């Protein structure tokens, strides 16, 4: 007796069962689009924690793939990874894939992979195409490319730069950096040069930087640490935050970060959301106040859902120079309590309001995270894919 795994639409199931009965095979497992995406995510990320997988897919789907011996949980890494069986299934699926790598058990490598997986699963839930194998594929959007896929022995076009991912969405081309307590220092000039060189051919109106971590609190803990360094070539992320000329967004790798990515993926999202929120009270900002998104009853209004805190600070300073003691902020509920109230409302710098669900639906259509089609998997040619008999890994 041996088992065969078949990726096929439902009409093919009975034909397979008849064949399996004649050849004394065990019953097949039908792989869905969700199943294939789980396998592909693990190929791209190398390993993913249960938390991220269960939030993105169902635990039932994950455990089914485990029972089929296509994925396995590592007690050492406390994360899921692909087995040789899972890699063989992917190899027969027709998708372009990054090279398969053996699992790593070095703690620094595990930490980097799991952080990267948080960024990737957040982007996936936001409807971003994360399954890119070449930088040139960033021309389509929304899309996310992982530079580490091109870091190989003897070939490392990204050098020692620390960019975790490149994101092309809406009008923005973003370099994403993981910023959490004790993350270390960065050579900003090298980072910006690599960012420009590797994305120069990708059309985007604005380049930006995203600082990502598990929560806003983690990012701000590092930015507020105030470390001093002796190496003048390197800078702390706080120093980068203070001197960077590009827009800089803070993003948590969770549901709020997913919604934030969807918002910035809408071209001209700042003006559109300001108009939706203020309705008939909307007044365009003065031409010399680019940090404002509108005037609300004569008061500067800033749409803060993108979490560009430096733009908020600039708006506060500009308002004070105009003789105004406060501005008005609008943001997502999960941004208001942990960050904006403490920094702006409680210090008297701003009145802070929560963006309503109806306003978000008007901008986005739906606030629900992306979910793959609840359908069996077809190849790109529209045919059934029969995977050869697979031995247990």
Q: Each PLM stretch: what is its role?
A:
Residues 28-51:
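Short amphipathic alpha-helical interface segments
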Residues 54-73:
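Short amphipathic alpha-helical interaction segments
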Residues 50, 54-55, 80:
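TRNA-binding/sensing appendages of the translation machinery
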Residues 37, 65-67, 77-79:
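Terminal low-complexity, intrinsically disordered regions
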Residues 43, 100-117:
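A short, highly charged nucleic-acid-interacting micro-segment common to nuclease
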Residues 72-98:
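Accessory beta->alpha helical hairpin/"wing" motif in late/C-terminal subdomains of nucleic-acid enzymes
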Residues 2-36, 106-110:
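Short alpha-helical segments that sit at the start of domains
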Residues 4-13, 117-393:
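Electrostatic, structured charged patches in enzyme active sites and in nucleic-acid/phosphate-binding
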């Amino acid at each position: 007796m041996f088992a065969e795994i078949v990726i096929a639409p439902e009409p093919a199931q009975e034909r397979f069962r008849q064949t399996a009965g004649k050849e004394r095979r065990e019953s097949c497992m039908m792989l869905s689009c969700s199943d294939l995406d789980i396998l592909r995510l693990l190929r791209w990320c190398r390993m993913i924690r249960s938390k991220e997988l269960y939030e993105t897919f169902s635990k039932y789907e994950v455990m089914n793939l485990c029972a089929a011996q296509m994925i396995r949980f590592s007690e050492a890494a406390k994360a899921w990874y692909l087995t040789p069986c899972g890699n063989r299934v992917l190899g027969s699926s027709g998708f372009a894939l990054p090279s398969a790598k053996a699992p790593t058990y070095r703690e620094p490598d595990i930490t980097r992979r799991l952080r990267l997986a948080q960024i990737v699963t957040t982007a996936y839930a936001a409807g971003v195409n994360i399954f890119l194998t070449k930088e040139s594929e960033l021309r389509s959007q929304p899309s996310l490319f992982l530079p580490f896929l091109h870091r190989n022995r003897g070939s490392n076009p990204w050098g020692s730069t620390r960019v975790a991912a490149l994101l092309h969405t809406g009008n923005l081309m973003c370099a994403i950096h993981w910023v959490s307590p004790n993350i270390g220092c960065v050579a900003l000039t090298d980072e910006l040069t690599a960012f420009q060189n590797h994305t120069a051919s990708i059309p985007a109106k604005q380049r930006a930087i995203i600082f990502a971590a598990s929560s806003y609190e983690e990012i701000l803990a590092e930015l507020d640490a105030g470390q001093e360094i002796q190496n003048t070539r390197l800078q702390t992320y706080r120093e980068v935050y203070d001197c960077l000329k590009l827009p800089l967004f803070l993003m948590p790798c969770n549901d709020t970060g997913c919604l934030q990515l969807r918002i910035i993926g809408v071209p001209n999202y700042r003006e559109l959301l300001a108009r939706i929120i203020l309705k008939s009270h909307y007044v365009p900002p003065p031409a010399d106040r680019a940090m404002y998104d509108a005037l609300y009853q004569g008061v500067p209004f800033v749409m803060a859902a993108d979490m560009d805190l430096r733009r908020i600070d600039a708006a506060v300073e500009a308002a004070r120079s105009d003789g105004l003691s406060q501005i008005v902020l609008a943001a997502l509920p999960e941004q208001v309590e942990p960050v904006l109230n403490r920094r702006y409302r409680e210090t008297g710098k701003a009145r802070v309001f929560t963006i309503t669900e109806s306003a978000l639906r008007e901008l986005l259509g739906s606030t629900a995270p992306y979910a793959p089609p609840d359908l069996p998997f077809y190849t790109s040619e529209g045919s059934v894919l029969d995977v050869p008999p697979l031995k247990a890994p």
